[in-house]
Amino acid sequence: MKESTKKQLVFLPLLIMGLALALSAVLYAVRNPWHRYVMFFGEYGSDKIYSETRLVSKEDTFQDQVQAFTDSLVLGPRTNRFLPLFASGTTVEFCIVKDGTAYVGLSENALFFSEECADIKTGISMLKRNIVRNFTNIDTVEVYIDSIQVEG
């Protein structure tokens, strides 16, 4: 066998593998169904704030993306040493984004106090902080619990 044929036999599989890798990277970038966010939670027994990276499904519209993020945030942290923002069973009833303001409605379970979650004022403050930090198009977050606007 000629020297050039041997080189081609070695080079051809490497070329095919390189093209396959490049194609898979492009397809992953285009079709990646997840968006990476950084969420902030308090720690049990301290005033420290820690971050947690979370993958949230990509949605078609900006408003739906904020809704998916908020739903995931309200579910609480994945790490047991971090405090959920609200009591167990709290859900997002609505999430509307208009003119740089997010209007977020939480179920009445957010009013329940538990040692297993942050206090209500801290939970609302952390909810606002998380949304504003992850979505640069949103400047203000107004929170409603059981359809009544609350400050935090």
Task: Provide a role label for each language-model segment.
Residues 1-152:
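Bimodal "functional hotspot" detector
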